[in-house]
Curated annotation (Swiss-Prot):
This is Serine--tRNA ligase. The gene is serS. Pathway: Aminoacyl-tRNA biosynthesis; selenocysteinyl-tRNA(Sec) biosynthesis; L-seryl-tRNA(Sec) from L-serine and tRNA(Sec): step 1/1. It comes from Prosthecochloris aestuarii (strain DSM 271 / SK 413). Consists of two distinct domains, a catalytic core and a N-terminal extension that is involved in tRNA binding. SUPFAM superfamilies: Class II aaRS and biotin synthetases, tRNA-binding arm. One of its GO terms (biological process) is selenocysteine biosynthetic process. It is found in: Cytoplasm. It comes from the Bacteria.
Amino acid sequence: MLDINFIRQNPEKVSRMLEQRQQREDIAKLNQLLDFDVRRRTMVQRTDELKALRNKVSKDIAVIKRSGQGSADDLIVQMKAVADEISGMDDTLKSLEAQIEELLLSLPNKLHEDVPEGRCADDNHIYREKLSFDHKLDFPLDNHLDLGKRLGILDFERGAKITGAGFPVYTAKGARLERALINFMLDQHTSVNGYTEVLPPLFVNRESLRGTGQWPKFADQVYYMNEDNLYAIPTAEVPLTNMHRDEILDASDIPLAYAAYTPCFRREAGSYGKDTRGFLRVHQFNKVELVRYATPTTSYDALQEILSHAEGILQALKIPYRVLLLCSGDISANATKCYDIEVWAPGEGKFLEASSCSNFEDYQARRANIRYRPEDGGKPTYVHTLNGSGLATSRLMVALLENYQTPEGSIRIPDVLQPYTGFSSIDQAAE
């Protein structure tokens, strides 16, 4: 969340940020927050004055009682009235602070100066692209749905029977190819890029969702187990970031870099009218996630590193892609700056998002209370957190199948994956 001191000192800047994000309705929340903040500070000052008066009156009563001269009854009555007022103000303050925190949690992050202004995804900027891999696709192309069904490697109908729409089944060489993708990406990120592998829980508590910003703003997107008060993770970003919640790290611990493979679960509420065929929008998918902890002076270098690591996977797989710098109206509420990587799916005839790489600066760290001690021994300060998909396999699988299809209807396996799959092509319905 944003620092209340920053909001107090820069209300116009925060209001402008909300306009840039196309969240003008939140300006009312900002104004309410500023009003509550003034009331809170006034009440704190008044409470401090009353407590000072209570201490003085208490000492005066003690002096009168020790001297045995005069009556302290009037002072005792006065002190009781002061104590009652303090108690009432403390209760009001507690309620006011809870409302302030709720408003702070609901406001989005500030925007980096490089973020282009725009209203929606159409205004995102192409940052760079790499489309010139040698895939000879000069024949009628199938999409991943038709390829998967014909080759017997993907079964969406049985997934729908078992669970419901949006829960795919991988079979035979499709399952092995999915596992190969996951293992290849983990090996790249750990052995080559230097990330520490983590195998985290798949369910988290509400405090963890609040720490990364999924709660309360995106509460309708997560699956909830009512009896256990736990949530299925929408991304490994949640457990990886909350590993250090309520901790003070040493400067020598920074930077931290974690990589994790997990299934991810998303309700995709509000997806009505969007293309939900096959892997284009699913409720369960696999992803290798990258999370970094950095200092304020190094976090934007770390963002470029995460982006290059995600791109490196696509370059090794020789899958055409482009990188978008998201505009102010499309960037997530939690991020200060974000790049999306979109893979080219020739069978679909369009680009598909396969990764988002974001810097949150101290927005998540404030929510999760993650700090570090500077090397000079100064006061602990908040870390900067970053994350990137490295990558999500569902849309990556779409691009792989569609780019590596042959005129004969087979699928060639990328060279870097063949040691993991144990086969070089998929050309028959089942094993």
